[in-house]
Amino acid sequence: MRPQIMPFYIEMGKGDGGITGEDILQNWMLKSNLKNVEILEELPLRPTKLVVAISEEIYPDVYTIEDFKEKVGDREVFIASEFPEIARKYAEKHGLNAIVFDPIGKTEAALLPPMPEADLIIEITEFGTTLKENMCRIIDLVMDKVHSVFIVNKESLKDEEKKQVMENLVTDLKEVIESRNLVSFYFNVPNEDDLRRIIDYLTENGFDPTISPLAKGGAAVHIIVDRSRVKFLKPIIRGMGAKRIATSPVITSGTNRAAQQKPFYLLSGIQREFPSASPFF
């Protein structure tokens, strides 16, 4: 199930919950005024941005939407976007005489010379790398932070069993996502004085270390740390007397609490029970 169609399926009651993007949900809200869908939880994935971009080659002197409006005047302009309703609202807001279309293939390809299909595009991006590679320049921001969200059917939330399953599933999803940036950080400290200094340092910096005694004295220490902090933490701990420093990925236990309960119509991949002849699954 593609995230682009998820809000519609949840609205129609073909599923109880699923994952989509805030941009996709907003586009559907503008198009169909969804009444039965709500966001249960925002997922901790890195957000993206919804931007307006033009071809640097076609419009070399355009750096802002105001520059673009001055350049095109009242003439008809073409806007390519996978979010046509958002694009129409944007065009109306800025007084553009626009024809909006959903491109076939990559949105940025609609700007490629010598025969571009569009004057500007409204596209999702994370860092803007692909746009730069295609000689596209960002001239405006439509949505600053676009998050992935878990959406649910409002009627499904009235069923306490379904609600509990979905809440458990979202908790599991968040734990798995958040653990991707974490590592287990292990080391031994043979000297008791060094151990006390290291434990004091760790607790002062927000860590909650697990300490296990070693057979020949000292202790083995374990903490969970963000991957980005390891290269800074390692020399500090080593300088304080730590030995045999090692790291490993954090393995989420994966209790799968949702799957252990009665299945329900969820459009994002857990086991479910429904007639095999259903055209929607």
From Swiss-Prot:
Give the similarity note. Belongs to the ATP phosphoribosyltransferase family. Long subfamily.
Note the NCBIfam families from the entry. Answer: hisG, HisG_C-term
Disulfide partners: none
Protein name in UniProt: ATP phosphoribosyltransferase
Extract one GO BP annotation from the record. Answer: L-histidine biosynthetic process
For this protein, the activity regulation entry reads: Feedback inhibited by histidine.
Task: Give the main EC class.
Answer: transferase
